[in-house]
A protein has these predicted regions:
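Active-site loop-to-helix "anion-binding N-cap" substructures in soluble metabolic enzymes
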Residues: 1-110, 114-116, 122-123
Length: 123
């Protein structure tokens, strides 16, 4: 036992460098939950996906692949972190206007009840 209670799944650098697919990330989320830990699922679009209007599609694809088959209880135990790949990989300024636009894209995103305040009031 490591004493770990949170595990990051789907970080963009692991997806890119280690070729982790959405399905593979989904398997990791399920394993983390099975061991009683809390997965932090990272989702985010590339600059090309953002500029071509594919942001919503990409985010939903990542979330569907990672969260499919989870029970309502498991969904509540999962944290979703929006991590725009373009802000990390391309050293673009991660302006709050982009973040606000992204999180308003689909109100069906899953977030932890305890994190609702941060979700709605992000600067």
């Amino acid at each position: 036992e490591t004493g770990c209670s949170y595990v990051i799944c789907g970080h963009s650098e692991r997806r890119q460098i280690l070729c982790e697919s959405d399905e593979f990330v989904g398997k990791k989320v399920k394993i983390v939950l099975a061991y009683g830990m809390t997965p932090i699922l990272c989702v985010g679009e590339t600059l090309e996906e953002r500029e071509s209007g594919q942001m919503k599609t990409r985010l939903l694809e990542e979330m569907r692949a990672a969260l499919s088959g989870l029970s309502p209880e498991e969904l509540l135990r999962t944290v979703i972190a929006y991590e725009p790949v373009w802000a990390i990989v391309y050293s673009q300024n991660n302006r709050s206007v982009f973040i606000r636009g992204s999180r308003r894209t689909d109100t069906n995103f899953v977030w932890r009840f305890r994190n609702r305040r941060e979700y709605f009031f992000f600067p």
